[in-house]
Amino acid sequence: MSRVAKSPITIPTGVEVTITSNLMSVKGRFGQLNMSIHPCIVITNTNNKLSFDITITEKKEQKKAWAQAGTARANTANLIQGVTEGWEKKLTLIGVGYRAKVMERVLNLTLGFSHPINYKLPEGITVEAPSQTEIIIKGMDKQKVGQVAAEIRAYHPPEPYKGKGVCYIDEQVVRKEAKKK
């Protein structure tokens, strides 16, 4: 049995969870998120606690079903946090002349190329640039926030010799020593 799926999720006040046969909808102060439910998983809501169980009785298939239940439980917890608090990722630009500027729904990046990069933001994502070298990405959907952060970082990932590039704020760049003559 999955240790993750065993622990129930307490639904905070102000969050409404609706479960149908194959779809879960979570509504909170930031909006609404939906998630599909695997057919072998049963989710029950008793006294504002969500518990997860499986419908499979065959011993061979139970391990996979419990893995699915654990994943569903983790994703549900992410949905609940997304509609109550939201998710955020912070990026920093390291390098001479590296700058970020937000203009409406477009993030303008100057990363040492001969041209500026204009990144169009997807729906449900907001970006702030408190300084020219910091980017804060916010949104309800954890996957979408992480995807946008990864796409922005991919324009110029940190290089190991000088450490220049776009880094996550808590990322440790492994530095290499320059070639000796």
Swiss-Prot record:
Protein known as: Large ribosomal subunit protein uL6
GO cellular component: cytosolic large ribosomal subunit
Any one Gene Ontology molecular-function term assigned to this protein's record: structural constituent of ribosome
Keywords linked to the UniProt accession: Ribonucleoprotein, Ribosomal protein, RNA-binding, rRNA-binding
Complex and partners: Part of the 50S ribosomal subunit.
Its job: This protein binds to the 23S rRNA, and is important in its secondary structure. It is located near the subunit interface in the base of the L7/L12 stalk, and near the tRNA binding site of the peptidyltransferase center.
Matching InterPro entries: Ribosomal_uL6-like, Ribosomal_uL6-like_a/b-dom_sf, Ribosomal_uL6_a/b-dom, Ribosomal_uL6_bac-type, Ribosomal_uL6_CS
PROSITE patterns from the UniProt entry: RIBOSOMAL_L6_1
Pfam families named in the record: Ribosomal_L6 (PF00347)
